[in-house]
Regions:
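Mature, extracytoplasmic segments of signal peptide-bearing proteins
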Residues: 2-5, 16-138
Length: 138
């Protein structure tokens, strides 16, 4: 056992350089946001405005050589509305280095007609008390 210690110590202290690849949290968020917007924009009316809030924190680092590629895919066929889980894979040199689940909160904002005062059941509406405002239609 005593003879094993110098060998392990020498290996740990050897000048081997590990290439470390890092991906920032903002890069992951941006990739998920672009994927979601590409999926959602074709289904929406022209006056709708999608807003995507990606819930991912922390940078990722792993030992690998090459440029990282971020893959994003859906986990279900449900429409992307509200909190939706995405699968994210990070590949370097054709090898998957990391897989994770990321939540994207998708909100659809659209202009709608709203009343400026409370309307009772059966009350007739007039355009005087209404205005056009943008609201969350998710």
């Amino acid at each position: 056992m005593k003879s094993l210690f110098p060998v392990v110590f020498a290996l740990c202290m050897s000048p081997v350089v590990w290439a470390e690849t890092a991906i920032s949290a903002r890069e992951v968020q941006k990739a998920v946001e672009q994927f979601v917007l590409a999926q959602v924009e074709s289904e929406l009316p022209e006056d709708a405005r999608p807003v995507v809030d990606v819930r991912w924190q922390g940078d990722l680092a792993f030992a690998a050589d090459g440029a990282p590629k971020i893959r994003v895919r859906r986990t279900s066929s449900r429409p992307l509305r509200g909190p939706s889980v995405m699968r994210v894979g990070i590949d370097v040199g054709g090898q998957t280095q990391r897989k994770m689940s990321v939540t994207a909160d998708v909100r659809i904002w659209r202009p709608v007609v709203v009343a400026s005062h409370m309307i009772k059941r059966g009350e007739e509406m007039a355009l005087v008390g209404c205005e056009l405002a943008e609201r969350d239609m998710t």
